[in-house]
Curated annotation (Swiss-Prot):
Classification via Gene3D superfamilies: MFS general substrate transporter like domains
Effect noted on mutating E203A: Complete loss of calcium binding
Major location category of this protein: membrane
Lineage: Bacteria, Pseudomonadati, Bdellovibrionota, Bdellovibrionia, Bdellovibrionales
Domain of life of the organism encoding this protein: Bacteria
Name used for this protein in its record: Ferreportin
Gene label: slc39
Length: 440
């Protein structure tokens, strides 16, 4: 008997998620370090790389969503997984060529710029493939295959996997990257890349098996006549959909610098608050730990209050804790700094809980034929918020002016509460399929 036949469909989906996320997190963690090995002291090179990846993904996101809706599931999974595979493989090749060129004294060569752009474009393709796979698994296969009464439990396990890989994969990747021969400083990068490549193979066969066993090869497809049609995006139609206000409420939370994982907050704590790196690192690690609490609190409140009410309570909790955090921040004393950081950690319970709720509401409410379009719109809005936030951060004349971003962050979270309450008050009883009530 095949091993795959012994695993439930839900288990196969979760295992596929674990494989892809662990590799993605490890690769993303070491890429900036590898760039700094090749270009020591040039932090702007790593920043420029990620800017290209973010902008490229931003531009291609709407088209990828429409493409998902116009193609069979098996084809979507195949393209998503193998696009990542060949993009990571290309990235390894370009890293090796860049390192060889720089070692040979070719810093002034035109080929250096060409290889760097090629590396960044491979990063865009890897990001796009990851996004296609995430939407296919989390926003299409999961709501189609997982029983409605099990969906909250399934999503909680998805979140646990995401948080576990967010913490564990970088630790393992950092250890691999640190140990290398002197003659081959990127040996760790290549090992991590190989780990990533190997993980794509079982992931693809797991997802293909899920689709074939479930009989979901055929889905309601949106008509698309050509590639030109795929790249013609009707954003006005997406924005006018009622689900947009749900998506917007979540995207507003990405306009916040009040995150343990935020680059801007970490820089402020180091430069202005003079906190040691060990405390900042502990703060970052605890952020994921507090996020795990939501994987217990959210399902519990769903059983007690229903999906929408649980989402409201978690989002409201985030607003209250960040309100206290910003009040402590405004006081400016040494003790209040730790109150500020403690409340940010508590707010992660609310943030991740609401994230679970918003994710499940999209799973239940978006019709099959528009899952790619509207879920890619969600990615588009969160990416836009990230770009806006970093653009605002780059315009700050002094580190101390970071306080304005803190106040804007609180305003964005409170506005998210208003938007979600207004949207959810019009929903009544949310159903999945024909008659599975979400509110109890």
């Amino acid at each position: 008997m095949k091993v795959q036949s012994l695993l439930r469909i839900e288990t196969q989906l979760l295992l596929g998620r674990l494989l892809t996320r662990s590799g993605d997190q490890a690769w993303d963690f070491v890429v900036p370090f590898a760039l700094l090995v090749i270009f020591p002291g040039k932090l702007q090179v790593a920043a420029f790389y990620y800017l290209i990846v973010k902008i490229g993904t931003f531009l291609l996101t709407p088209s990828s969503g429409k493409w998902i809706d116009t193609h069979p599931r098996i084809q979507v999974v195949k393209w998503g997984v193998w696009l990542q595979f060949f993009a990571i493989l290309a990235g390894m090749v370009f890293f090796g060529m860049l390192d060889g060129l720089v070692r040979a004294g070719g810093r002034e060569s035109w080929l250096l710029s060409v290889l760097f752009i090629a590396l960044a474009l491979s990063g865009v393709m890897a990001s796009l493939g990851s996004q296609i796979t995430d939407i296919s698994v989390g926003n299409d296969l999961a709501p189609s295959l997982v029983a409605p009464e099990k969906l909250t439990h399934f999503n909680s396990w998805l979140r646990r996997i995401d948080l576990a890989t967010e913490v564990g994969a970088p630790i393992l990747a950092g250890a691999l990257f640190a140990f290398h021969p002197e003659q081959l400083p990127l040996a760790g990068l290549f090992l991590i890349g190989l780990w990533n490549l190997v993980s794509f193979v079982p992931e693809y066969f797991l997802l293909r098996n899920v689709i074939q066993r479930s009989g979901l090869k055929i889905k309601v497809l949106t008509e698309a006549q050509s590639w030109k049609d795929t790249f013609h995006i009707n954003l006005r139609g997406s924005f006018s959909d009622p689900i947009f206000w749900l998506i917007l409420s979540y995207a507003l939370l990405w306009l916040s610098v009040l995150s343990p994982h935020g680059v801007l907050l970490a820089a402020y704590l180091k430069d202005e608050m003079r906190l040691p790196e060990t405390e900042i690192g502990l703060f970052r690690g605890l952020g994921a730990v507090f996020g795990l609490i939501s994987t217990v609190s959210f399902p519990y409140l769903v059983r007690r209050l229903g999906l929408i009410s649980s989402s409201r309570w978690h989002l409201g909790f985030q607003g209250v804790t960040l309100g206290i955090a910003v009040t402590a921040f405004a006081m400016g004393s040494t003790a209040s700094v730790y109150v500020f950081l403690g409340c940010i950690l508590l707010s992660r319970v609310g943030l991740y809980g609401f994230s679970n709720g918003e994710f499940e509401l999209r799973q239940r409410l978006i019709p099959e034929g528009r899952r790619g379009e509207l879920n890619s719109l969600s990615s588009l809005t969160t990416t836009s918020a990230t770009l806006i936030l970093f653009s605002a951060g780059s315009l700050l004349p002094q580190t101390e002016d970071f306080k304005y971003l803190v106040y804007v962050s609180l305003a964005a979270v409170l506005l998210a509460n208003v938007v979600f309450i207004k949207w959810s008050s019009r929903q009544g009883v949310v159903t999945s399929g024909a008659a599975e009530p979400v509110e109890s």
